[in-house]
């Protein structure tokens, strides 16, 4: 009975649990996988690197390449991927933009390459996030300036070399813009610099008062009036040099209109124009005052030094790039001058014998105070005037000091940019020099190739052309290997006989073999054997009359390789496989000899029916023969007095 109760009691309890109300509301449905319609995982293969993302992620930006139907042109049906032959590191930032909606600019990547990737995927640079936007614009601006400078240098002919068919104008403009291209350009560069210095010094010295000892009483007068002929001759010589330079620059300029509108062209005109106006101006007292005014413009000749000084050019570029900051400084100073001049005028208005008679008269005091000069010709006397004068001085220091760091940073940036440009030009010159050296090396190799008999003359008469001699592939590999050995061992290897002469100096037979064997035996200095042995083909057997080595063990196949030995200048020796000095060879011998290296390989038992078995002159007639075959492929062995090549 107890056993029966124990059996059905758990089922009763389970049923009772089902009767009790466990929750007041119905239970939620069982969790399941919700099928997402229209969303799938897309695989994007960028140069072998696979990226996976949702289709809806890319569809958020339908105006781009990945978000539009244009990406279907890059779909590979075999792999089921979208393949793009682009930079995978850049694509990581592009894909993050689709995921997060923020585009970041990588610092370690080239800004131009980044722009190209954005243009390919249809993204505009304005999508760059605020965290990277300022740095992106600075880098892009710097890169644009560098490219503009390179383009100007290329148009001006400031490159390392000019084309062979360059015109006279191009050569002249290159000489003016880059004086270090030739000796004549460098001489003209220093001559013009000398005359610029003479002109500036003469313009200063002619105003120095000089005493005239001939007049009684002595009277001081300017040196220009005392020695008019000397100063006129110096001025004439300088102006002639400047005029010739200006006309030559105008003739050689790539764009004459652009040259006439340039700042340096205007400086040249202003430097030489007063001379010609004074030369043709009538000597009349009524117009002498205007001529004296025109002579003031001669001081602008000093700006011609900017062509001869890289620092002055950098300073000009800096001021040009800081135009907005300088405009802000000028506007701020103008406002402060007007405000403090008005305050100082009303503060000093009630005093007797004051110098602040009007607001424009107070401008001078405000300018001198804000620039911290303080001449002392105008001084406030009231307490209010002194207080406002102190405030004016402090505000001037703050206003002037604000744009200074920006100007300094721009100067430093342009300076380092010019340094990098000079370094790139120097590296480009080095690369071009290496290319010319390589070309000259190729020419020398061609001449050596011809000297070694690899080229022959074809045709007759005066017109003879060089053509490559028809050689077997085996012989071509032989010459190629010799060339490689010369480069690696710094020794020169030469053949005693050409390939055709070596074949004509021996008698050939017929023999077939499956494998290659090598044996070398000493022969006369005037004979050399070589042949080419392809696989499973009939091979020529060479029987030597003066063979000194014989094979006594079974039927052996031997391939003899002979190579010419010449005296090596290197004192040290190098060994190689397949290279072995013969016992009877005198290493101190200066004459050429041939060395034998024997590698024996058992002959296969099966022979072709047409195989001939020549008897060895030194053997015992056991079916073995000394077969000599010369393979032109060789490996050098440099002995103390000889150089030996033995081939596989």
From Swiss-Prot:
PANTHER family assigned: POTASSIUM VOLTAGE-GATED CHANNEL SUBFAMILY D MEMBER 1 (PTHR11537:SF174), VOLTAGE-GATED POTASSIUM CHANNEL (PTHR11537)
Catalytic activity: K(+)(in) = K(+)(out)
Motif, Selectivity filter: chain positions: 372-377
UniProt-annotated stretches for the region Interaction with KCNIP1, KCNIP2, and other family members: 2-20
Keywords: Cell membrane, Glycoprotein, Ion channel, Ion transport, Membrane, Metal-binding, Phosphoprotein, Potassium, Potassium channel, Potassium transport, Transmembrane, Transmembrane helix, Transport, Voltage-gated channel, Zinc
Ranges where the record places region Required for dendritic targeting: 474-489
InterPro entries given in the database record: BTB/POZ_dom, Ion_trans_dom, K_chnl_volt-dep_Kv, K_chnl_volt-dep_Kv4, K_chnl_volt-dep_Kv4.1, K_chnl_volt-dep_Kv4_C, Shal-type_N, SKP1/BTB/POZ_sf
GO biological process, alphabetically ordered: action potential; potassium ion transmembrane transport; protein homooligomerization
Entry note about domains: The transmembrane segment S4 functions as a voltage-sensor and is characterized by a series of positively charged amino acids at every third position. Channel opening and closing is effected by a conformation change that affects the position and orientation of the voltage-sensor paddle formed by S3 and S4 within the membrane. A transmembrane electric field that is positive inside would push the positively charged S4 segment outwards, thereby opening the pore, while a field that is negative inside would pull the S4 segment inwards and close the pore.
Localization of this protein: Cell membrane
Name of the featured protein: A-type voltage-gated potassium channel KCND1
Entry-annotated residues carrying Phosphoserine: 458, 555
GO cellular component, one term: postsynaptic membrane
Taxonomic source organism: Bos taurus
């Amino acid at each position: 009975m107890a056993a029966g109760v124990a059996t059905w009691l758990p089922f009763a309890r389970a049923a009772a649990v089902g009767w009790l109300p466990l929750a007041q509301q119905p239970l939620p449905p069982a969790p399941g996988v919700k099928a997402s319609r229209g969303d799938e995982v897309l695989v994007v293969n960028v140069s072998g690197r696979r990226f996976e993302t949702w289709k809806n992620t890319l569809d958020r930006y339908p105006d781009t390449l990945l978000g539009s139907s244009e990406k279907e042109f890059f779909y590979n049906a075999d792999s089921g991927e979208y393949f793009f032959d682009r930079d995978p590191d850049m694509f990581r930032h592009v894909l993050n933009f689709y995921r997060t909606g923020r585009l970041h600019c990588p610092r370690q990547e080239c800004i131009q390459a980044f722009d190209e990737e954005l243009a390919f995927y249809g993204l505009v640079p304005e999508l760059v996030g605020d965290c990277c936007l300022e740095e992106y614009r600075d880098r892009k601006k710097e890169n644009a300036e560098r490219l503009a400078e390179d383009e100007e240098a290329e148009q001006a002919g400031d490159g390392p070399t000019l084309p062979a068919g360059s015109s006279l104008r191009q050569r002249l403009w290159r000489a003016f813009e880059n004086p270090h291209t030739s000796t004549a350009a460098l001489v003209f560069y220093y001559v013009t610099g000398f005359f610029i210095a003479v002109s500036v010094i003469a313009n200063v010295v002619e105003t120095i008062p000089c005493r005239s000892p001939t007049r009684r009483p002595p009277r001081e007068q300017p040196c220009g009036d005392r020695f008019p002929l000397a100063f006129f001759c110096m001025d004439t010589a300088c102006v002639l040099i400047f005029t010739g330079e200006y006309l030559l620059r105008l003739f050689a300029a790539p764009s004459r209109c652009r040259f006439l509108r340039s700042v340096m062209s205007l400086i040249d005109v202003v430097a030489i124009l007063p001379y010609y106006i004074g030369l043709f101006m009538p000597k009349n007292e009524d117009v002498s005052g205007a001529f004296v005014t025109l002579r003031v413009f001669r001081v602008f000749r000093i700006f011609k030094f900017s062509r001869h000084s890289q620092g002055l050019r950098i300073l000009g570029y800096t001021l040009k790039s800081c135009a907005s900051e300088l405009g802000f400084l000028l506007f701020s100073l103008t406002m402060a001058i007007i405000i403090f001049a008005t305050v100082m005028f009303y503060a000093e208005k009630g005093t007797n014998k004051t110098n602040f008679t009007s607001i424009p008269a107070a401008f001078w005091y405000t300018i001198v105070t804000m620039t911290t000069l303080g001449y002392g010709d105008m001084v406030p006397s009231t307490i209010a005037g002194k207080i406002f004068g102190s405030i004016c001085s402090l505000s001037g220091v703050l206003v002037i000091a604000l744009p200074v760091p920006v100007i300094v940073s721009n100067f430093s940036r342009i300076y380092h940019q010019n340094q990098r440009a000079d370094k790139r030009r120097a590296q480009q010159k080095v690369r071009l020099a290496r290319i010319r050296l390589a070309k000259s090396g190729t020419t020398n190799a061609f001449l050596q190739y011809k000297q070694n008999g690899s080229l022959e003359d074809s045709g007759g008469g005066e017109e003879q052309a060089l053509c490559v001699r028809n050689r077997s592939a085996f012989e071509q590999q032989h010459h190629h290997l010799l060339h490689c050995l010369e480069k690696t061992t710094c020794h020169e290897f030469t053949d005693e006989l050409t390939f055709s002469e070596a074949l004509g100096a021996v008698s050939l037979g017929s023999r077939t073999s499956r494998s290659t064997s090598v044996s070398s035996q000493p022969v006369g200095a005037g004979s050399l054997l070589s042949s080419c042995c392809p696989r499973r083909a009939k091979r020529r057997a060479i029987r030597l009359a003066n063979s000194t080595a014989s094979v006594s063990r079974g039927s052996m196949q031997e391939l003899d390789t002979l190579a010419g030995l010449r005296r090596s200048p290197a004192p040290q020796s190098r060994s190689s496989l397949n290279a072995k000095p013969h016992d009877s060879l005198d290493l101190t011998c200066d004459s050429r000899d041939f060395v034998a290296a024997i590698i024996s390989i058992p002959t296969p038992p099966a022979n072709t029916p047409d195989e001939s078995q020549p008897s060895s002159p030194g053997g015992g007639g056991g079916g073995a023969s000394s077969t000599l075959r010369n393979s032109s492929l060789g490996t050098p062995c440099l002995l103390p007095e000889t150089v030996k090549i033995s081939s596989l």
